[in-house]
């Protein structure tokens, strides 16, 4: 596995040697704008693998994306290879309908230490919940970013990531009540601890998430990619584009219903993805917002 191939995949041409916050931010932003957050393997009859070699082949060589356990594993490898001080962490995703965090550790994120300051880096949440900059681990501090304001709080050695969102304007009236729209202005995202993890700690959950009928990943096919101004999402046959802050404190959210035969071209032109097997788009009833 060649780090230069990773840099080429994300379009990164700047310093490889400066292990500072600016470099870390640039790596994160290049990755989230080049590598989609997606689960299409499941809906093509293929598995979501955790081995680094398989992930590298899928994302770097075949120019696909992946879900958090894959894209953040790749990010962890790349940052470590560059020389950053990294720690793999595990998170518990907030289930909005149930109003509680997941009992299983289903999210992978990365801690990076720079000059005795700790940061959370996460390229694997996608949609409008995706951070665009590393978050310094300071409890109660607000982090205004392009997508929203992110907030980390710590209580009894557990950290919580929340988001304060803008209003949203949906010009297509057919979608103003879409179940894909986030209804809460204050959104809990996930919790985590600073206990170091290894990729093996996620193996059972990796299997569960792609096989259980209760999993959002089996319920919906999705693909999400950040842009310099917003984020594209494809959920089932519904294509959306959210432009952040198109007006003061308002996001513009555009919806379009696709015919199934249009999806292949949309995946290529918007997300840069060419699938080897036939995708069966799915939009089940599990909670998932864009």
Swiss-Prot record:
CoA binds at residues 103-104, 208. GO terms for molecular function: arylamine N-acetyltransferase activity; N-hydroxyarylamine O-acetyltransferase activity. It is found in: Cytoplasm. The keyword Cytoplasm applies. GO terms for cellular component: cytoplasm. It catalyses: an arylamine + acetyl-CoA = an N-acetylarylamine + CoA; an N-hydroxyarylamine + acetyl-CoA = an N-acetoxyarylamine + CoA. Its main location: cytoplasm. Keywords: Acyltransferase, Cytoplasm, Transferase. It comes from the Eukaryota. Substrate binds at residues 106-107. PANTHER family: ARYLAMINE N-ACETYLTRANSFERASE 1 (PTHR11786:SF8), N-HYDROXYARYLAMINE O-ACETYLTRANSFERASE (PTHR11786). Catalyzes the N- or O-acetylation of various arylamine and heterocyclic amine substrates, and participates in the detoxification of a plethora of hydrazine and arylamine drugs. This is Arylamine N-acetyltransferase 2. It comes from Mesocricetus auratus (Golden hamster). The gene is NAT2.
């Amino acid at each position: 596995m060649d780090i230069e191939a990773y840099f080429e995949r994300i379009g990164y041409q700047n310093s490889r040697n400066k292990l500072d916050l600016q470099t870390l931010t640039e790596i994160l932003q290049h990755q989230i704008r080049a590598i989609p957050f997606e689960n299409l393997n499941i809906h093509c009859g293929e598995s979501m693998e955790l081995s680094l070699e398989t992930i590298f082949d899928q994302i770097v060589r075949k120019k696909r994306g992946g879900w958090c356990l894959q894209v953040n594993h790749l990010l962890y490898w790349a940052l470590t290879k560059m020389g950053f001080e990294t720690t793999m962490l595990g998170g518990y995703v907030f289930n909005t309908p149930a109003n509680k965090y997941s009992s299983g550790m289903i999210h992978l994120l990365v801690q990076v230490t720079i000059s005795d300051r700790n940061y959370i880096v996460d390229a694997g949440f996608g949609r409008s919940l995706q951070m665009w900059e590393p978050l310094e681990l300071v409890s109660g501090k607000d982090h205004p970013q392009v997508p929203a304001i992110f907030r980390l709080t710590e209580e009894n050695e557990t950290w919580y990531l929340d988001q304060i969102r803008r209003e949203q304007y949906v010009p297509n009236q057919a979608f103003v009540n879409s179940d894909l729209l986030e209804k809460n202005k204050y959104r809990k995202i996930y919790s985590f601890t600073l206990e170091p993890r290894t990729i093996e700690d996620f193996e059972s959950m990796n299997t569960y998430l792609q096989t259980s009928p209760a999993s959002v990943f089996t319920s919906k096919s999705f693909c999400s990619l950040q842009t310099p101004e917003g984020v594209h999402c494809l959920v089932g046959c519904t294509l959306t584009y959210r432009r952040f802050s198109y007006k003061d404190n308002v996001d513009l959210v555009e919806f379009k219903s696709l015919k199934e035969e249009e999806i292949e071209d949309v995946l290529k032109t918007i997300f840069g993805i060419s699938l080897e097997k036939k995708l069966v788009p799915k939009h089940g009833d599990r909670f998932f917002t864009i």
